[in-house]
């Protein structure tokens, strides 16, 4: 079965003023849609067809740039839309809060580490909060549409939170002020969803 562009759980203007409606529309209906169609074309008629996106990325031949770029773009954006919401939704679960404190000292320590990873990612890419095999948390960043599920990336684990720092994610509203966009991102994080994803990996 072909991959499909996921529908959003909210309207394009629902994240304003933190993320503007025009950016959301272009980001979802153009960029994510493009990754979806190009991924389907790249796997058509191959043994990759029919795999879940997670299995496809975990077993990826990293030299296959079409699947690497478009499969990464498909997965990354599908996660991104789920971990943001119109209002800063819910609170951290006790389990996730304790894990954050164990890994980063405090929530503010986590936020500072995550924000630095996002702000200092050179060029296009993503910053992630990942759950490693032992259950501990790690913050890392990846270039372009790479993500921690891919082999040999250097920040292994399952991402439960990600921020897109490609310019198309923020430039209409924030221009070159990436740190302002990162701060605004924290106003729309869906902590209930992030906590649920963490709990599922425990």
Where are these regions (language model features)?
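Feature for soluble, non-membrane regions of globular proteins
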Residues: 1-202
């Amino acid at each position: 079965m072909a991959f499909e562009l996921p529908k959003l759980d909210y309207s394009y203007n629902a994240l304003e003023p933190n993320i503007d409606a025009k950016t959301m529309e272009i980001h979802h209906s153009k960029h994510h849609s493009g990754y979806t169609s190009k991924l389907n074309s790249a796997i058509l008629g191959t043994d990759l067809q029919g795999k879940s996106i997670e299995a496809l990325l975990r077993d990826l031949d990293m030299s296959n740039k079409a699947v690497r770029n478009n499969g990464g773009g498909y997965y990354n954006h599908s996660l991104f839309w789920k971990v943001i919401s119109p209002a800063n939704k819910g609170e951290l679960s006790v389990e996730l809060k304790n894990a954050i404190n164990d890994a980063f000292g405090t929530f503010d320590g986590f936020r500072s580490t995550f924000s630095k990873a996002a702000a200092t990612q050179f060029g296009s890419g993503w910053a992630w909060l990942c759950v490693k095999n032992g259950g501990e948390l790690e913050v890392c960043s990846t270039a372009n549409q790479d993500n921690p599920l891919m082999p040999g990336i250097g920040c292994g684990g399952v991402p439960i939170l990600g921020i897109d720092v490609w310019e198309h994610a923020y430039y209409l509203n924030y221009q070159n002020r990436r740190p302002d966009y990162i701060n605004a991102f924290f106003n729309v994080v869906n902590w209930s969803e992030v906590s649920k994803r963490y709990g599922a990996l425990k």
